């Protein structure tokens, strides 16, 4: 089974040997079929020159920090059906278009998110690594992700916590009577769209729990879907501990893209590392960091 971002697929597509949509749909080996069709009008030497010329150009770009990250971002962006840019200028022009994402006026990027937001967050990760060369964004790890999601960095729970989960959240402030109080508040708001359990948690946890849901880009990060699911019902500090554990285990369990890791480790410029929550100041610093990294990358 071939994939759009496999190495041989990228090489052959870049060499101009891209199968037609019909061939891609109907053929088991569409690129082999394409080459066989090309051999009807071209010599083997000509086909071979097309392939090795593309290979050496890609090899040159692999060793170029800017082109490695720019070309990789284009290959792995959403809705990338064919690689059109062939020259350095065309590739960098395409990157500039990826950087044109504008946060939603209603600050509801999460509910409205699509390929533009995904591509922008991917670009922010790529630019983050480029700025820290020889640190590379691992497109190899990226390709192993079966499905992507957008994670709330700091989220209201919106779910029914059991006694074990509430104890994990409250620590020494937990007791059976406190759990009963939470259950009462939760049940009163259940089915009425009132989220009274969330309001109760906000009062109990203070700054560690958001008073309102924030769907703006300053509260969103790119994460594999399975990794996102594993963070279910965790506060910010719980997510931070989980991501730190993944890193210590060399990402064998789950993988977080570098900029996402930096968010939860609070290692980006301007983030308050000692605060166990995601503040408004952190969101602003995160947005500025993304904007500066991407701005430097496309400049």
Task: Give the role of each language-model region.
Residues 1-299:
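Flexible coil/loop and intrinsically disordered segments
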